[in-house]
Amino acid sequence: MVDVGCFAQREGEIPEPGPEQALLRVLSVAIDPAIRGWLNERGSGYLPPLGLGEPVRSNGIGVVVRTTTEALPVGALVTTLTGWQEWALCCSDFSDIAKLGTVIPEGITPVEALTVHGQIATTSYVGVEVVAKPEAGETMVISAAASAVGSLVGQMARRRGALVIGIVGTEEKRSWVTDELGFEACINYRTDDIASSLLQLAPKGVDIFFDNVGGEILDTVLRRMAMHGRVILCGTLATSNSVEPYRLQHWERILSRRFSMTGFNSMDHWDRFPEATAAVTQWLADGSIKYRAHVLEGLDRAPEALVRLFLGDHLGKLVIEVADP
């Protein structure tokens, strides 16, 4: 388990941008489950693990202060993997996917960009509109339903007419997703039996499971999948701190119920970023989707925030404000 003692602050020189690069003054950084995977020796699978002494990799927002590319002009608000640092370089091409910078449209604040736009919007939008494609009347279950991605996915699925059931870990989160976001029901995995709850809430089975956590919750929902359903694998929050991988006990249901399991990453669909941003902006404006951010001030609180993420001690997207815009 990661604790705050695993991290230390260091000072370094501000880097100069190379060809097709921009220097960002970092304004905010997001605290995401993916960070934990990058801290493991084996990495996350799609980006290499971090070495000791390297800045923690993290999605962030910064303002361009120096640039060598017209695609990232001075003054632009840009999202990239800034890391836990006050200054960061990004690039305007795909020469380094981990440092690809994308300009955020005007009128969007740094916290909004990390909470409901950028990677969050693209992941949620692609997950629903391209991968899951819920249809009216289908039952869709979402784990980590009060998270930034989980809450958006649920609201987007409801817009398509799906019956949405969330899985969360506190009563406060359960109330938020049902009372404010409009989910049909929500299961508290700490107090409710997931299998029996799903039998009651979805007696004909689960058509779509959008999974952000993996582990035992994934294994349990597999038992309740409907014939020809689909499981969308988006995250492994429940097993990020595990030394040994969780071994599924109910994998045979994939065969007997003939449902599919699909893993996806928004990096494979970054060309949909403008489309996702436009859609989310419109849905925010017309009130059909809502969001919540849990903001902490100061880069020194980033380790604390990461610990809180895995304890579930927050409501909404965890964001660190590094500097004033």
What are these model-predicted stretches?
Residues E11-I31, E41-W84:
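Glycine-rich beta-strand-centered segment in the early N-terminal region that forms part
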Residues V56-V63, P73-A144, S288:
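NAD(P)H dinucleotide-binding glycine-rich loop of Rossmann-like/cofactor-binding domains
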Residues T79, V141, I187, D207-F210:
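N-terminal Rossmann-like NAD(P) cofactor-binding module of classical short-chain dehydrogenase/reductase
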Residues E86, G169-V177, P245-W251:
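Short, glycine/polar-rich helix-capping loops at beta-to-alpha or helix-loop-helix junctions
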Residues L114-D192:
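Mid-domain Rossmann-like dinucleotide-binding core that forms the NAD(H)/NADP(H) cofactor-binding site
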Residues D193-P203:
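Short amphipathic alpha-helix with an adjacent loop that forms part of the alpha/beta core around
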Residues E216-I289, V322-P325:
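Glycine-rich phosphate-binding loop and adjacent beta-alpha segment
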Residues S288-V295, P303-P325:
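C-terminal capping/lid region of NAD(P)-dependent oxidoreductase domains
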